[in-house]
Amino acid sequence: MAIRKYKPTTPGRRGSSVSDFAEITRSTPEKSLLRPLTKSGGRNAHGRITTRHRGGGHKRAYRVIDFRRLDKDGIPAKVAHIEYDPNRTANIALLHYVDGEKRYILAPKGVTQGTPIESGPTADIKPGNNLPLRNIPTGTTIHNVELRPGGGAKLARAAGMSIQLLGKEGPYATLRMPSGEIRRVDVRCRATVGEVGNAEQSNINWGKAGRMRWKGRRPTVRGVVMNPVDHPHGGGEGKTSGGRHPVSPWGQPEGRTRKPNRPSDKLIVRRRKTGKKR
């Protein structure tokens, strides 16, 4: 993937860029793997906003991605197409299995049209192949990693993400996460070899607010320009600074967004590095 920069022909084009989609081989998705996707606008089942700054955007269809690949052990497949997916930053690869079934997976870096793909404990250590952690050599770069055996991949699924397998001891494998956190995961969990493709996606300059609205992203308003009824930093005469340490609209101090005392915390060997010492 390469980034194409626009010339400043209009204010919205100035500084903006777009992917050249050179890796994409087909523009229409596989119909049998599409599902309807209803927009929530950031609301839950009670109609209350649970995620701010969401709403609008272009209509999308959900592409069903195979995050398990457990039932395809020993069945060879070949990459038929690399496609764009509007629901994620990574591209997706359409696999044609020899038994006739078609499935989508996240497109790893280096996997192109015609690349053979396989799953299972005896699969080769090549990008796109899916194996249990116990069968992957130490030091290998992996992505699409499960947290629980058979639970489906949860870690390193965004464009350009990868995890390094540091070692294996007893029933656990030690992984270095993209954030720098080091944690242990059951060796029966499965992972895909290689890193997620489309890494240049993070270098795209969106250029104007309208392109973010197409993606369903609404404006993020600063608390200091709100009224006191809307935010703890609101109000004041003129451009005031807020007069207190940064907080959320509900008064919670900024940072520390991780939920404390999660059951899986006992498997964390070393925490990620944060910007501030607390």
Swiss-Prot record:
Bias-annotated ranges (Basic residues): 45-57, 269-278
GO molecular function term, any single one: transferase activity
A Pfam match: Ribosomal_L2_C
Gene Ontology BP terms: cytoplasmic translation
Keywords: Ribonucleoprotein, Ribosomal protein, RNA-binding, rRNA-binding
PROSITE patterns: RIBOSOMAL_L2 (PS00467)
Source taxon at top rank: Bacteria
Region described as Disordered: 1-20, 25-57, 224-278
Gene Ontology terms: cellular component: large ribosomal subunit
InterPro entries: NA-bd_OB-fold, Rib_uL2_dom2, Ribosomal_uL2, Ribosomal_uL2_bac/org-type, Ribosomal_uL2_C, Ribosomal_uL2_CS, Ribosomal_uL2_dom3, Ribosomal_uL2_RNA-bd_dom
HAMAP family: Ribosomal_uL2_B
PANTHER family membership: LARGE RIBOSOMAL SUBUNIT PROTEIN UL2M, RIBOSOMAL PROTEIN L2
Physiological role: One of the primary rRNA binding proteins. Required for association of the 30S and 50S subunits to form the 70S ribosome, for tRNA binding and peptide bond formation. It has been suggested to have peptidyltransferase activity; this is somewhat controversial. Makes several contacts with the 16S rRNA in the 70S ribosome.
Entry's family note: Belongs to the universal ribosomal protein uL2 family.
Subunit structure comment from the entry: Part of the 50S ribosomal subunit. Forms a bridge to the 30S subunit in the 70S ribosome.
Name assigned to this protein: Large ribosomal subunit protein uL2
